[in-house]
């Protein structure tokens, strides 16, 4: 699933390519991709004639503000891709939504697993009232509110493994399996450590590691282990420099011990028993 760095990479690409271009129409090939409004016709009527002022990111959500004061929301979920293409490009078999722009360009939503969603929120409506998941999000790791005190308060009363807690979007918005593993390695904390057992100094290290790992991945254009592509169809490069994620059985880059993998809360967790305690 695309996580914060991948979504941020897409956001930056969209801001470079799509702003202030008139939307001339669209085509919805899979109706359930449109979460709101209920009518696909209303969705297409809403976007047509409008233009995008800016793309924003909240956690793993993409939100486009428009010149009509409306919002276009997108969540990539597991396999979603937003690609900027010429309208005459052959359709990928997993194309779900096409948004046409002037100059024969289009924003194409491709989604193999079909869990991705799009929303059109008309002007005058609160975006959180329609995209209800936004109200449940924690603060962003790049927000000034993401302090050591904030993270400590979120973690200390939870009797569950630290890795599981970090995947909870009400604890840290945008963090997922890849970067939780990477941040825990960088901070020296084992993924199965209970939140109640994590010391304040470890939380300080963890907060710093989360920010550093996310920044490094954004600079690398995100991570591509399966489906992620940026808006130009290019893979992310963070996987080549990952410390532990997807490296089970390989030597630790710090101590040389073997990277291990366990299942924790139904998700794979990668770590080094020597570097993490």
Curated annotation (Swiss-Prot):
Belongs to the FPG family. Binds 1 zinc ion per subunit. Involved in base excision repair of DNA damaged by oxidation or by mutagenic agents. Acts as a DNA glycosylase that recognizes and removes damaged bases. Has a preference for oxidized purines, such as 7,8-dihydro-8-oxoguanine (8-oxoG). Has AP (apurinic/apyrimidinic) lyase activity and introduces nicks in the DNA strand. Cleaves the DNA backbone by beta-delta elimination to generate a single-strand break at the site of the removed base with both 3'- and 5'-phosphates. DNA binds at residues 94, 113, 158. Its EC number is 3.2.2.23, 4.2.99.18. The active site is at 2 (schiff-base intermediate with dna), 3 (proton donor), 60 (proton donor), 267 (proton donor). Its cofactor is Zn(2+). PROSITE patterns: FPG_CAT (PS51068), ZF_FPG_1 (PS01242), ZF_FPG_2 (PS51066). It comes from the Bacteria. PANTHER family: FORMAMIDOPYRIMIDINE-DNA GLYCOSYLASE (PTHR22993:SF9). The lineage of its organism: Bacteria, Bacillati, Cyanobacteriota, Cyanophyceae, Nostocales. One of its GO terms (biological process) is base-excision repair. GO terms for molecular function: 8-oxo-7,8-dihydroguanine DNA N-glycosylase activity; class I DNA-(apurinic or apyrimidinic site) endonuclease activity; damaged DNA binding; zinc ion binding. A zinc finger (FPG-type) spans 243-277. Monomer. It catalyses: Hydrolysis of DNA containing ring-opened 7-methylguanine residues, releasing 2,6-diamino-4-hydroxy-5-(N-methyl)formamidopyrimidine; 2'-deoxyribonucleotide-(2'-deoxyribose 5'-phosphate)-2'-deoxyribonucleotide-DNA = a 3'-end 2'-deoxyribonucleotide-(2,3-dehydro-2,3-deoxyribose 5'-phosphate)-DNA + a 5'-end 5'-phospho-2'-deoxyribonucleoside-DNA + H(+). This is Formamidopyrimidine-DNA glycosylase. CDD domains: EcFpg-like_N. Keywords: DNA damage, DNA repair, DNA-binding, Glycosidase, Hydrolase, Lyase, Metal-binding, Multifunctional enzyme, Zinc, Zinc-finger. It comes from Trichormus variabilis (strain ATCC 29413 / PCC 7937) (Anabaena variabilis).
